[in-house]
Amino acid sequence: MKEKLTEALQALKQKTPLVHAITNVVTVNDCANSLLAVGASPAMCEAADEVFEFSQLAGSLYLNLGTLTKEQEMAAYLAIRGATLKGIPVILDPVACGAIPRKKATIERLGHFGRFTVIKGNLGEVKALAGLAARVRGVDSLDEGNDGLEACQSLARAYGCVVAATGKVDIVADGQRACLIENGTEMLTRITGAGCMAGALVAGFCGAYEDAFGATVAALLTMSLAGELAQETSGGELPGTFRAHLIDQLSLVDEALIEKRGRVQWL
């Protein structure tokens, strides 16, 4: 499976996929810059009278519900409909769905308009969507339990898609295959937007590589490796310096680094 990760990164660099992102106002710039850093092309288009057509031109669609307005909600329905009609991968980031009931209702309605290729959230969000008890604080997960794999597999089977739960150890599952990504750094929890950036990267990789499971693993591993390197090169204590180094290091992750430092446990 490890060769799939390097294949996915090569595909991303070669194809420069256009990623249509409807994301939150807190991290829109971070998502755009992270996509540019790895070689994708971001388009933060969310006007309701444009998204249906635009989503059909993209390589993938990234829906992030972090600061969901009524206007964004309508745009998301139109965009997922357009993307699904064209067979374009749709990545959902269900930010704070464990804390805000309206967001779970929105996700259910999105499922009526189209199909998710990947659902990427923290463990609390994944457990909430899977109908399991989840401990959350706003957009953050307080869960670190041993039932994360079960939650991911259950949600993957329910939606027929890949599910990823990020945390100290990232979990990726598709109902049959699963893996644990053991790279990363606690510094990623000390800046706003690391999870959103990871979701955007998943969209970038899925826009270039057909195997959504492999693309998701490659994206999250890229984010984790960049975080490790950013901590090393920035001194590891100042979050603002770390953020700047993170974007730089995203641009430097290559096949050799994945082979040398990637710690992925295939289950």
From Swiss-Prot:
GO terms for biological process: thiamine biosynthetic process; thiamine diphosphate biosynthetic process. It catalyses: 5-(2-hydroxyethyl)-4-methylthiazole + ATP = 4-methyl-5-(2-phosphooxyethyl)-thiazole + ADP + H(+). InterPro entries: Hyethyz_kinase, Ribokinase-like. Disulfide bonds: none annotated. Substrate binds at M44, G193. Pfam families: HK (PF02110). GO terms for molecular function: ATP binding; hydroxyethylthiazole kinase activity; magnesium ion binding. Its cofactor is Mg(2+). The keyword Lyase does not apply. ATP binds at K120, T166. Pathway: Cofactor biosynthesis; thiamine diphosphate biosynthesis; 4-methyl-5-(2-phosphoethyl)-thiazole from 5-(2-hydroxyethyl)-4-methylthiazole: step 1/1. Its EC number is 2.7.1.50. Keywords: ATP-binding, Kinase, Magnesium, Metal-binding, Nucleotide-binding, Thiamine biosynthesis, Transferase. Catalyzes the phosphorylation of the hydroxyl group of 4-methyl-5-beta-hydroxyethylthiazole (THZ). HAMAP family: Thz_kinase (MF_00228). Belongs to the Thz kinase family. This is Hydroxyethylthiazole kinase. It comes from Desulfitobacterium hafniense (strain Y51).
